[in-house]
């Protein structure tokens, strides 16, 4: 059970409902529990939503790359919520199920090419702490400066999301089904 109330739009004062409306418009699904928990601080929800939307829609890195990175963050950090939600996003982005099922073995699985391995290795190391120089050099072989910056911020953001999900004990929504 979540450690904070999971708020709906009508639970907020009228002055704060606009951010909830923006949230619902940008997500296109029923409102996720992480967002409902963050609605306890609507001012922060507003800023967090802006960053999250920019990372989803305003970057050069493709959706497949982003979702591989986010799945690795969720896997390494032990966040079932993040992993499950981004599993679905990865499938919708076009990543094959077989590849997702082999994620833990990305270093040796023939389903992953050198570019995939570079992003997954970076996401794993960055989530755990220090990124090796060799890992960074390999990442940079595949991504230019802008894309590398977007990857750094994306991985950092989703590691931050885990640091919200885990202590607040956010669980998957009753309506959520992993594909």
Tell where the protein language model's regions lie, with residue ranges:
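Hydrophobic alpha-helical segments
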Residues: 1-179
């Amino acid at each position: 059970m979540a450690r904070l109330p999971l708020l709906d739009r009508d639970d907020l004062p009228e002055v704060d409902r606009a951010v909830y409306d923006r949230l619902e418009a940008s997500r296109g699904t029923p409102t996720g529990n992480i967002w409902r928990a963050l609605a306890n601080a609507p001012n922060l929800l507003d800023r967090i939503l802006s960053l999250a939307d920019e990372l989803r829609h305003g970057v050069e890195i493709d959706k497949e790359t982003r979702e591989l990175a986010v799945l690795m963050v969720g896997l390494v950090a032990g966040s079932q919520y993040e992993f499950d939600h981004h599993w679905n996003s990865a499938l919708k982005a076009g990543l094959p199920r077989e590849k997702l099922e082999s994620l833990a073995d990305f270093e040796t699985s023939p389903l992953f090419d050198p570019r995939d391995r570079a992003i997954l290795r970076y996401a794993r190391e960055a989530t755990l702490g220090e990124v090796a120089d060799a890992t960074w050099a390999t990442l940079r072989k595949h991504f230019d400066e802008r894309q590398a910056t977007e990857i750094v911020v994306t991985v950092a953001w989703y590691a931050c999301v885990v640091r919200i999900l885990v202590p607040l004990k956010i669980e998957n929504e009753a309506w959520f089904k992993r594909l």
